[in-house]
Amino acid sequence: DQAGDPNLYAGGPCYVGIDIGRRKDLFVIWVFELVGDVLWTRQVIERRGASFAEQDQLLDEVFSRFRVMRCCMDQTGMGEKPVEDAQRRHGSTRVEGVLFTSPNKLTLATVGKQRFEDKGLRIPMGNQALRADLHKLQKVAGPTGAPRFVAESDAGGHADRAWACFLACNAAETGPIEYAYHPVPRKDTLRGNRRTL
């Protein structure tokens, strides 16, 4: 399978999801490339116990290697500062912080589940850790009866890979940011100066 190999990146728009973890849980960056209408996994970076400086460096490398249209990051708890720093470095229109509230987790899981059901994404074959993370997620009724997602934490993490994947799916939901510009004449042409080469 071609999913998960960054060397197969074809230059298309990319969408990134990041689950922040520092000590017990994993720090995971998930990169999807949009090819047609399918999100292909291009890279999954996992680190346990990575310093925030290393996490920043890994994210900067992703932004320099891939054409990142949008990045959704876990902003909950210790994620506040990494999100703020990433927005400062890469722009607040490209980096969005997502608080892991029950409604937001439900939205993320629903978007991810829909992508899987529609065969709209490709993940690396044989990634047992990811499959285990996906199976850790359970939809349960909250105290008010509203559905919410929970995941048991174990030595493999707290469904960190699944949340990073779902955050990347969420980043792709808005599609590329459209913009336009109007060129202005160069200063030297406004003054009537001619440039020679």
Where are these regions (language model features)?
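RNase H-like, metal-dependent nuclease domains and their acidic two-metal-ion catalytic environment used
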Residues: 1-102, 106, 110, 114, ...
